[in-house]
Amino acid sequence: MPGFRSITVPAAADDPALRGAVWYPCAEAPAAVDLGNVTKLFGITVTGAKDAPITGYMLPLVVVSHGRRSHLVMHHDLAETLADGGFIVAAINHAGDNYFDQSRSAELSVMLQRPTEIKRLIDFMLTASPLAATIDRERIGVFGFSRGGHTGLALLGASPDWAGRADYLWKPSSEWQKQVRDAGFPRRDIAHDPRIRAGVIADPLAAFFTESSFADVAASIQLWASERGGDGVTLESVAAVGRCLPTRHEAHVVRNAGHFAFLIPCRQALAKAVPEICIDPPEFDRPAFHKRFNADVLAFFQAHLVGAR
């Protein structure tokens, strides 16, 4: 059963501290863990033995990147499944692009900041976290959804082609148009992390990628697409990512699903607070899908981080 603990990745230079959480294998009995404002506002709790000792040694690590204006807890059922399967799972709230702090959500620079934050999370987990001595640094994976999918692809070696996607950035409807007009395209390179050997990418925002963006991607990838899409992601945009990947990958299309199907099934309080992420087509069963999805993600990471050791 999973253990659970909160973490804080320390501030670095001009980068703020990052609040996060870790799930991990544990022998103690789990219980519902109150998450403060998240529980109060949305009725969400996680299942785990809070701050209990970890079970195991040389365990694989999976890091998680959430979507735009979201929260690390929105993938907690997957984290619990992976922890039950022998993985350490670490997630953060991206600075300025999470539910409780949206101050940088509309800034193009946040797309560069996000991969750097996940690299900082990995650094922390391997060197300064209470679980550092139990992690196998040769077995690291990433899960990313939506903007977090863009983050995951970048970490795996993909590079945005700002000039190549100028048509998108300059569209009058683009939230980025004024920023590009005033400041030009981003000038610093996006962060890659060769320590990451496998990635599960769900409905990634792919608007800044072109065919040449993926030349340096060599890791094993499981790519998920919702049939109906949403929030700037379409079935075709995800399929285009798959066609551009230079190595073989595992691809899944979730029939009848919208973009937010990859988020946890909604309880009443969450559905009332943020209804747009909780509405599914009548023919789609999100809880049933998550049982299959979580199992498939676990099997992929077991094959590529455990079995391939």
Regions found by a protein language model. Name each.
Residues 1-62, 270:
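Domain-level recognition of soluble alpha/beta enzyme cores
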Residues 19-36, 150-166, 250-271:
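Short, solvent-exposed beta-strand-terminating loops
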Residues 27-48, 164-211, 228-230:
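Mobile cap/lid helix-loop segments that gate and shape the active-site cleft of serine hydrolases
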Residues 44-59, 64-101, 229-234:
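Short substrate-entry loop that stabilizes the transition state in hydrolases
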Residues 58-60, 136-138, 193-198, 216-221, ...:
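Short, proline-enriched alpha-helix->beta-strand connector loops that line the catalytic pocket
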Residues 107-138, 150, 154-159, 164-180, ...:
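Alpha/beta-hydrolase active-site loop
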Residues 142-144:
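Short beta-strand immediately N-terminal to the catalytic nucleophile in serine-hydrolase-like folds
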Residues 216-289:
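Active-site-adjacent alpha-helix of alpha/beta-hydrolase-fold enzymes
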